Amino acid sequence: MRAPTDMPSGPERRERRRGAGRGRVFLVVAAVVLFLLATSLRGIAGFYTDYLFFDSLGLQKVWSGVLGARIILGLTFTGVFFVLLLINLIIADRLAPKFRPAGPEEELLERYHQAVGRRSGAVRVGVALLFAVIAGSGVSSQWNSWILFTHRVDFGVTDPLFDTDVGFYVFQLPFLSFVVNWLFAAFIIIFIVTAVAHYLNGGIRVQAPLQRVTPQVKAHLSVLLGILALIKAADYWLQRYELTTSTRGVVEGATYTDVNAQLPAIYLLLLIALLSFCLFIANIWRRGWVLPVLAVGLWAFVAIVAGGIYPTFIQRFQVQPAESTKERPYIRDNIEATRAAMNLGEVQTQTFEYDENLTAGDLIDNAETVGNIRLLDPGIVNDTYQRLQADRGFYRFNDLDVDRYEIDGRTTQVVIGARELNEAGVPQQTWEGKTLAFTHGYGAAMAPANAVNAAGQPDFVVSNVPVESPENIPIDQPQLYIGEDQTGYAIVGTNRQEVDYVSDDDETVPFEYDGEGGVRLDSFVRKAAFALRFGDIDPLISDFVEDNSRLIFLRDVRQRVETLAPFLRYDSDPYPVIVDGRVYYVLDAY
C-alpha cells in the first residue's frame, strides 16, 4: 500500500479526472469525425465523378446549370424557413411570462431553464437551423420545375375552362403548387415548434387549473393559424387550374364532374379558408378557443362533404348513367386540344371507295406493299437470333426492333438487334476479366422481316462475328461499349489488351481502344474518386491502369441519356441503327 503522503491530493485527483474526461471526449469526437468523413467521402466522390462524366462529353454547362439551380433552391428555402422559425422563437421568448406560478410542471421547466441559462439565444439559432436544414433538404429536387418557372414561354393557346395560356400550366403551375404546399408544411412545423417554445417558457400550462394559455401566446398562435388558412386558400386557388389535368372522366382533362361539382367545391373551400382566417384573427381579442374550433370543424365538414362525397355522387349517379351526353363537350375540347398540340388542326377528311374482295390484280398492282408484309415478329424470333447469332455466351440480344433499310435497291422492313455484352456470360468472372478484358459487345444482326431462308430461319443480311454485311450497310467499328440494361463499368486503353472477339478456332482476337470516350484516369485523385464511387479499390491499385486509360460508366443507354438531359421524357425502348459504319442507339424524347 502507498503511504498517505504518497497519495495525490484532492486538487490533483480532480485535475486527473478532468484530463481523463477530456481524453474520452476527444476520442468520441474523433470517432464521430472519422465516421462522418468516411460516409461523406463516397458522396463527394460521386459528385466529382458526375462532373467528370459531363466534362468528358463537353456538357459542363448542363452539370453546372443543374447544380446551380439545386444550390439556389436549397439555400433559399432553407434560409426562408430559418428566418421564419427564428423570428417566431424570438417572439415566443419575448412573450414569456415574467412570473410562472407554482405547479406540477414547474420543476421540470425550472431544470430546463437552468440547463439553458444564458445560452437561450444559441439554442434558438440551433433549433431554427436544425429544422431549416430538414425543411430545405429535399427542395433541390425541384430544380427542373424552377428552371421551367424562370423560363416561361407563352404558347399562344388558351385552355377552354379558365382561358389561361397553356404555357402557365407547363412552366409555372408545377413550381407554384410546390411552393404553396411547402409553405403549408413549413408553417405547420413552425406552429408546433413555437407552441413547444411557449410551453417551455411557461406561456402554456397544460395542467393549470384555470388559464392554460396566456392572452399573448393565444394571439401569437392565432396569427400562425391565420397564416396557415391563407396559404391553404392559395392552394385552393391553384387547385382550380389542376383540374385541367384531371383523370376522373373518360378523357384526360376537366370533365363534367370536375366543372360542375369539384370546381364549385373548391370555390366553397376557398371561401371557408378565408372565413377561417378571419375567425383566427378575431380570436386574438376573444377568450377561449371557440372560434378556431368552429373554423376547423366547419372546414373539415365542408372538405369531406363538398370536396369528396358530392363530386363522387355526381360522377356515379349523374354522369355514368348518361356519360356520352354529359361528357360530349369535354371530349370535344380534348380532341381539339390534342389536334392543336400535334399540329393536326388542318386535317382534311376524305372518303375512299374500296372493295373487300381481293383479286390477283390487286396483289400485282400492290406488289411492293405485299412483298413487305412482315413474317418475323421481333418478340418471337429473339431466341432464334440468340441461338444463331450470339456466337458466344458473353454476347446477347437484349431486344429486337423493326426498322427500314435499303436491301437490293428496295426499302425493306428489317428486324435488327445489337449484339451486346452479356456480363454474366463472361468466362473470366474476375475484376480484370469483366472490367479490362471483356469490355464491349460486337456489331449487330439484321434480317428482312418479310423473308426466311430455306430452313425457315431469318435470312440474315448483317450477321456473324466478325461482321459480314452488304456494302451499303457497312459496320467498320462494331465495338459496343454501351447498350440496353448494360451495367458496371469498363476501363479501356490499358496495358491489358481487350478481347475483341473469339474466332471460330477459339483464338482470341485482341483490340486496342483508340477513341476519346470515357473519363481519363490521368491522376491519383480521379482513380481514387472512381474507386470510392464503385466501392472497388482495383482502379486505384491495378498495374494495368495507366494515365492514358479511360473509364466508361453509366453504360445503359436510357440511364446515360436521362443523366445528361433529365428535363426530357423518354420512350422506354432505345433501338439500334447502323449509320456511317457504326452502331448507334436512338431514344425518342419528348
Where are the language model's segments positioned?
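Soluble extracytoplasmic regions of secretory-pathway and membrane proteins
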Residues: 3-17, 24, 30-55, 59-590
